[in-house]
Curated annotation (Swiss-Prot):
Organism: Lawsonia intracellularis (strain PHE/MN1-00)
Keywords: Ribonucleoprotein, Ribosomal protein, RNA-binding, rRNA-binding
Biological function: Forms part of the ribosomal stalk, playing a central role in the interaction of the ribosome with GTP-bound translation factors.
Gene3D superfamilies associated with the record: 3.30.70.1730, 6.10.250.290
Gene Ontology MF term list: large ribosomal subunit rRNA binding; structural constituent of ribosome
Protein family membership: Belongs to the universal ribosomal protein uL10 family.
Gene that this polypeptide is encoded by: rplJ
PROSITE patterns: RIBOSOMAL_L10 (PS01109)
Name of this protein: Large ribosomal subunit protein uL10
UniProt subunit comment: Part of the ribosomal stalk of the 50S ribosomal subunit. The N-terminus interacts with L11 and the large rRNA to form the base of the stalk. The C-terminus forms an elongated spine to which L12 dimers bind in a sequential fashion forming a multimeric L10(L12)X complex.
One GO cellular component term noted in the UniProt record for this chain: large ribosomal subunit
Domain of life of the native organism: Bacteria
Entry annotated with the keyword RNA-binding: yes
Length: 172
């Protein structure tokens, strides 16, 4: 790879890092091409991307920018997962793949400039996704008026029954 190709690759990695809100550095030693292709497809479905790059090029690309905190993590065999949309979906995809594959391990990550450890990424994967959180919030917001109406119905119902009893007594 000549100098101009390296510069183009560095700028491409830098552009991906600048647009990504979530970046994960993984170790991938010994993984088969089939498994790697499967991981890339799953990450694409989740709104992410998985690249295997040379460490020196990755270090240069990550020298500045929001994810520069992970530039020292590029050692040995490593690859980068970029998350563009929802960090939780990317974390879940990577975490699920790590559980099934013995060849990939998570090293570190960066969520909008904050360094994440392997444990942090596992915890992030346990969180509900954005659509699930929206559904939970809407369910909670919907429960308030429903409970309010039920409360008033429970207050008025005995009064209604008493009035019906008085009306039946007067009619008889």
């Amino acid at each position: 790879m000549n100098r101009s190709e390296k510069a183009a690759l560095i700028s491409q990695i830098k552009a991906k890092a600048d647009t990504a809100s979530f970046v994960v550095v993984t170790d991938f030693k010994g993984i088969s091409v089939e498994e790697l292709t499967c991981l890339r497809a799953k990450l694409r479905e989740s709104g992410g991307e998985y690249l295997v790059v040379k460490n020196t090029l990755a270090r240069i690309a990550f020298t500045d920018g929001i994810h520069s905190i992970i530039k020292d993590q590029f050692k040995d065999n490593c690859a980068i997962a970029f998350g563009y949309n929802e960090p939780v979906a990317i974390a879940k995809t990577i975490n699920d793949f790590v559980k099934t594959s013995k060849f990939i391990t998570v090293r570190h990550g960066s969520l909008e400039g904050t360094l994440l450890t392997t444990k942090d990424i596992e915890d992030l994967a346990k969180l509900p996704s954005k659509p699930e959180l929206i559904a939970q919030t809407l369910g909670t917001l919907n429960a308030v008026p429903t409970n309010f109406v039920s409360l008033f119905a429970n207050i008025i119902r005995p009064l209604f029954y008493a009035l019906q009893a008085i009306e039946a007594k007067k009619a008889a």
